[in-house]
Design a protein with these regions (language model features):
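Acidic two-metal-ion nuclease catalytic site recognized across multiple nuclease folds
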Residues: 147-148, 160, 164-197
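Conserved glycosyltransferase catalytic-site signature
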Residues: 101, 124, 160-163
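Conserved non-catalytic scaffold segment of RNase H-like nuclease domains
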Residues: 1-7, 12-105, 144-151, 157, ...
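A structural motif
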Residues: 135-145
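Substrate-recognition/cap helix-loop segment adjacent to the acidic, metal-dependent catalytic center
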Residues: 98-120
Length: 197
């Protein structure tokens, strides 16, 4: 039987525009045959923090103190290069993955280091839209999806924690296990009964 390998990635950034904002953190979880086998979390020292969107820093929990042990951009580029090459045989997974890929490409160009996110890609937003929306999920934010599934989020909006939540999604939804689908059906019935009362 062929091994199924996923590389779940997430970035935290100083804003939404990859041409002027920076990657503050990179997280990854490697899943092989439904089991988490490796994780990576890098905090990266920003060079242009004055260009940061204050709201983005607030969401990501950025403070100088929290990032005091962060790696330099150069070191981060070398670590990422090795990590992505090591896992080039995986299918890349992320929540709004194109956003993360844009920042990784900008970081790659800035550091003059080739960083290739393995292809093919699976976006968990699209996966949840296909599998969970029929059961009543309306918002495709990771917070809303986890709440819908009754999953408590720890350290939301940190790169590694978001990857861990996406790993749970990919393990349960790709393909959906019969047990998980039965649980969704039960949740849908309970919601429907609640709206009748």
């Amino acid at each position: 039987m062929e091994t199924i390998k996923y590389l779940i990635i997430d970035t935290e950034t100083t804003g939404l525009d990859a041409s002027k904002h920076e990657m503050l953190a990179f997280g990854a979880v490697v899943v092989v045959d439904g089991r988490i086998v490796e994780t990576l979390e890098l905090k990266i020292k920003p060079a242009r923090i004055e260009n940061a969107d204050k709201k983005a820093l607030e969401v990501n929990g950025y403070t100088e103190r929290a990032w005091r042990d962060a790696v330099t951009k150069r070191d981060a580029a070398e670590i990422l290069k090795y990590f992505l090459i090591t896992h080039r045989d995986a299918t890349s997974v992320g929540h709004n993955l194109q956003f993360d890929i844009k920042f990784i490409k900008a970081f790659s160009a800035e550091q003059n280091v080739e960083l290739r996110v393995p292809w093919p890609y699976i976006d968990t937003r699209d996966l949840c839209r296909a599998v969970l929306a029929p059961f009543g999920l309306q918002s495709m934010s990771l917070d809303s999806i986890c709440e819908f599934l009754g999953w408590k989020r720890k350290n939301a909006h940190t790169a590694l924690s978001d990857c861990e939540d996406c790993a749970k999604l990919i393990i349960n939804l790709c393909p959906p296990s019969p047990r998980f689908l039965l649980r969704l059906k039960a949740m849908q019935l309970l919601r429907n009964m609640g709206s009748l009362l």
